[in-house]
Every structure is written in structure tokens, then in C-alpha cells.
A protein has these predicted regions:
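Conserved catalytic SET/PR domain of SAM-dependent protein methyltransferases, capturing the structural core
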Residues: 1-119
Length: 119
């Protein structure tokens, strides 16, 4: 579940949507956590999907440390990549703010820490 003090905003045609803070989110705050509404798919289930659903999973999911694909039910799926990210995945199904995130600032994550082929 994405932090409640966020909103979804269209950025542009190339990037699409992003998640933005509506209030200050202090450093160390949990910004996203896996919850029961998120879909967790095994690689076998993912590969059995029809092309339309497979495209959605490929675009919006990430691979967890078990090699499963996690598809967020809320707009947590729209957190964009940045090499200078303000959020960090812990590897334990939640993310934290690694610095203060100001109102109007986009929440970002460094995708380099996600979707690793090997733990």
C-alpha cells in the first residue's frame, strides 16, 4: 500500500504517471508496503497469462527476492525510476524514504535494486 500522503499525477507522454507527495514525508517513513490486495505471481503463472495481461504484469510489476512478480493494486505501481531516488526498497516487502520528501515532489526508486536475477 502506498503512503496515504501521495497522489497520482500525469507527467508527460514519455514518462506517463508518477506518484507525488501531498505533504512532507520525513526520512525513514515507510512509503510503500506489500498488502493483501497486491497480487504475487509465480513465474509459471506469469508465463501462462494471455498477452494483454502479460503486458500489464511486465510493465507494472517487480520481481521480489523469491523470484515472484508483485503487481501493486494501488498507484504504488507508478513509482518511477531515478538514480538519485528518494525511496529505497528494503528487500522485506516495504520501502522507506531515504531523505525528506517535500510536498509536490515525486517519489522515486532506483530500479537497479529491484528485479535482480540472483539474490
Amino acid at each position: 500500500m502506498i503512503h496515504p500522503d501521495t497522489t497520482l499525477r500525469f507527467i508527460d507522454d514519455e514518462i506517463g504517471f508518477g506518484v507525488f507527495a501531498t505533504r512532507k514525508i520525513p526520512r525513514g517513513t515507510i512509503t510503500w508496503a506489500l498488502d493483501k490486495f497486491d497480487q504475487v505471481l509465480s513465474p509459471e503463472v506469469k508465463e501462462s497469462l494471455d498477452p494483454i495481461h502479460l503486458e500489464i504484469v511486465d510493465k507494472y510489476s517487480y520481481k521480489n527476492r523469491k523470484g515472484e512478480y508483485v503487481l501493486c493494486w494501488d498507484f504504488g505501481r507508478y513509482v518511477n525510476h531515478s538514480f538519485n531516488s528518494n525511496c529505497l526498497s528494503t528487500g522485506y516487502e516495504f520501502e522507506i524514504a531515504i531523505r525528506d520528501i517535500e510536498p509536490g515532489e515525486e517519489l522515486t526508486n532506483d530500479y537497479g535494486y529491484l528485479n535482480l536475477e540472483e539474490p
